[in-house]
Amino acid sequence: MLVVAVRFSIIWDILFMSDSKLATKRKLKQEEAKGQYYRFNHPSDHRHWVKVMPGGVYATSDQEIIHTGLGSCVSACAWDIEMKVGGMNHFLLPFNNQFESQHWHPQALLSDSSRYGCYAMEVLINRLLSMGAERERLKFKLFGGAHLMGYQSLVGEKNVEFVLEYAKREKLNVVAQDLGGAQPRKLLFDPQTGQAWVKRIGFSSAHAIKQDEELYQHSIDKQIPSDDVELFQ
């Protein structure tokens, strides 16, 4: 009888789940299959941990820890404390060469490179709105954009300039930031409380982060499909 009751409860939840929540769950499964994030059981924590990869966006209402590694990329963490939903993105601006990155400026929000950053921010915000968050209640924390050696130094700087300009223009409630600097970071985020933990790591330990970001940068397609973002009021 207990098994039957549990199964009925699951079916009931599915039948009466809103279309937007069902769409969000389907989207999350597609993104996990594409490698945008990975979920796993932490050996010393009862919660699931979710690692967001470069180019990924993840939002949840579950008791989970979201984490990532950041070199020149940036991450925005956002949450609605009343609805207990939150999420994280992980992105950089794609530049074809050093000349392009040198001549880009943060007010150029309509450029191809900026459109990619805008897309990453919009997906995160709209994902949370689809889960019941209110835009006026959303709070943000911004991380990353390290000035790494060589060409990547410019990329990190431009990523920081972009995310700060975007937050200013969109009037986002940014309550904390840890941007720039010369070292990569490891970032942990509790999406229900908004608490975040940052650890700076040495370059000898950051090879995997740099490799992931380089692979991501080479794979970026700057033509963002207009029908990939659903807007919620």
From Swiss-Prot:
One GO MF term: protein-glutamine glutaminase activity
EC number: 3.5.1.44
Enzyme class: hydrolase
SUPFAM superfamilies according to UniProt: CNF1/YfiH-like putative cysteine hydrolases (SSF64438)
Alphabetized UniProt keyword annotations: Chemotaxis, Hydrolase
Catalytic activity: L-glutaminyl-[protein] + H2O = L-glutamyl-[protein] + NH4(+)
Function in brief: Probably deamidates glutamine residues to glutamate on methyl-accepting chemotaxis receptors (MCPs), playing an important role in chemotaxis.
NCBIfam families: PRK13493.1
HAMAP family on file: CheD
Protein name, as recorded: Probable chemoreceptor glutamine deamidase CheD
Organism field: Vibrio cholerae serotype O1 (strain ATCC 39315 / El Tor Inaba N16961)
Species lineage: Bacteria, Pseudomonadati, Pseudomonadota, Gammaproteobacteria, Vibrionales
